[in-house]
Amino acid sequence: MNRRNLLKASMALAAYGSVSASGLFAARALAAAADGEIEHFDFAELQAHAKKLASKGYVSNKQVLPPVLANMTPQQFNAIRYDPNHSLWKDVHGQLDVHFFHVGMGFKTPVRMYSVDPQSKQAREVHFRHDLFNYENSGIDKNLVKGDLGFAGFKLFKAPEIAINDVVSFLGASYFRAVDSNKQYGLSARGLAIDSYAKRQEEFPDFTKFWFETPDKNATRFVVYALLDSPSATGAYRFDIDCQAGQVVMEIDAHVNARTDIQQLGISPMTSMFSCGTHERRMCDTIHPQIHDSDRLSMWRGNGEWICRPLNNPAKPQFSAFSDTDPKGFGLVQSDHEFSSYQDTVVWYSRRPSLWVEPITAWGEGEVSLLELPTTGETMDNIVVFWTPKTPVKAGDSMNYGYKLFWSPLPPVSTPLAQVHATRSGMGGFLEGWAPGEHYPTTWARRFAVDFNGGGLDRLPEGTGIEPIVTVTHGKVQDFNILVLPDIKGYRVTFDWVPDSDSVEPVEMRMFIRTGDRTLSETWLYQYFPPAPDKRKYP
């Protein structure tokens, strides 16, 4: 799962039947880069084609690249630049445009690109050719690059920064990303996840073809269609992409067909990285206080409950499932955008976007699945989140999921109650204000501090009694304290977890705060990994 080495299988499928060339001049005027024969395109036909494809055996079309491309470095790959004079909508002179990625390095699968006239529904393929790219600074001899190699992916631009800063990128398997107002890429989404945490090896479906509706000159939204293929599934996707001033909003219509029985189907998957944060310091022996693309999983359950689950970098793979019916939304959040929290001047974790999923069709019963993997470096994605339907997926099944993706600094919706501001963890068994030095506590314990703010906490009458409601799956909790935090206009709840056995199984913790019968906050969930019994001691 190295974000920089996405080496997945892909497939190029037969094109739709050709039509007459009567619309050739109009099609060329709309997309000068498109040079293929005119074909008919319709989303309903794409759905039918994907369903029919699922009834046939899978055939991989991964190609063997010329050595000059297969062996090039990441620096060489990035140095091959798409020529903006051949952008897909250069002749439209509008607000939107598309550039393509060259194949090479780990991106070996040909992805086919098409330009579509939305009025006539005529489509033409954009074939790979040398004049679409600038090789000058790459050290690559383009004369050694032969044949129609297809493309690796594409990126989208919007005025006023056309050909300067891209706002959306699709590259590798079914991965895609977008930026927000901070103009910094972070976590990724995927078209589909299959068996991410199952007995058999994880499968990475590929987007094998894309169709781009040519926009009007004043249009501000991209419309892109995609064909997905893999050994276990096919899919037809429609992306309506609105690149707004402060966020990117994608409305996705996904039609998925099972080619085989699927043990674990992941809908609207997202992939991120969490190395260390305020509560997890195991891998933070650097100058950086925190290193992560996302710090929490946020969920708005179908029953209205809001949940905050801080992410972990565990010592071994951990899988958590949160049952729900018709979820209102969920996502991976980068809640802290202060430079001082990261001290990073290279990849700018303080500028990373959050990603929120909002279902727009009924998703029924299922679970939000969270996979956390150990990572030793920030280039390895180790967090995966997706929706898994409760009903087992059998060969021949077809499913439709509609949803929106919001790429923004923070999710577009939030609870009216108090939210978790931060989670911290450290040595327990002593009074706050005391620091280890002359002596240590005699009993080992682990302390947790959870800060809440918002939701009117700063407007509670003086003397209001606040009660933390805490449950744990094993061990016991004690030594509660509730502290006012004026700097965040909220409260801090601290407590100690004390083991009652030698078990090293993860402790599932759950907490919210209330006053009387009134709930004041969202629900905090946390997974703690106790040390081995012989490590439960102080110096």
UniProtKB/Swiss-Prot annotation:
Signal peptide location: 1-29
Q: How is it modified after translation?
A: Predicted to be exported by the Tat system. The position of the signal peptide cleavage has not been experimentally proven.
The lineage's top-level taxon is Bacteria
Identify the main location. Answer: periplasm
Q: Which PROSITE patterns match?
A: TAT
- Pathway(s) this gene product operates in, as recorded in its UniProt entry: Glycan metabolism; osmoregulated periplasmic glucan (OPG) biosynthesis
**Family, as annotated:** Belongs to the OpgD/OpgG family.
Q: What name is this protein filed under?
A: Glucans biosynthesis protein D
